[in-house]
Amino acid sequence: MSITRLLTGAGVLLAATLATVAAQAPGPKAVTTSSGVYTAAQAARGEQTYMSICVACHPAGTYSAAAFRAKWNGQPLSDLFSLLSSTMPKQEPATLEPEEYAQTLAYILRENGAPAGKEPLPASVKALKQIRIDMPAKTPAP
């Protein structure tokens, strides 16, 4: 066997081994709304915004109904943020500050059972693209 064949075979074996190890290694942990992506204070401010601006068209509970959860579960959080920030409030779309939209979104997440965390929800579409909406099914009240 020539040295070239031996080295080529060893290289192929090494590449296959490395590919197998890389495939088995855990990747970066996915960030979801179940990871605590907003603060309790941020959600409280979002509730104030919701109750003063949004509730006239969207009664309390609108954003925690089964149809809402089914539509958004698994989607990037940036999609919901973009929808809110470009179309709401209905009479004056896109008139709130980005932080106000993020606060309102934090409130919506809280209402859907997502836990609060230590860092505020960012008001950036780019950052929110990294977060998936995870809304576990609500269990009916006894």
Segments predicted by a language model, with ranges:
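Electrostatic cytochrome c docking/interface patches
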Residues: 24-49, 92
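Flexible coil segments in periplasmic/lumen-exposed cytochrome c-class electron-transfer proteins
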Residues: 96-142
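Short, non-ligating residues that shape and space the ligands of small metal-coordination modules
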Residues: 63-64
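The canonical Cys-X-X-Cys-His
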Residues: 46, 50-60, 104, 108
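Electron-transfer interface patches adjacent to heme c in soluble/periplasmic c-type cytochromes
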Residues: 40-41, 67-82, 89-102, 120, ...
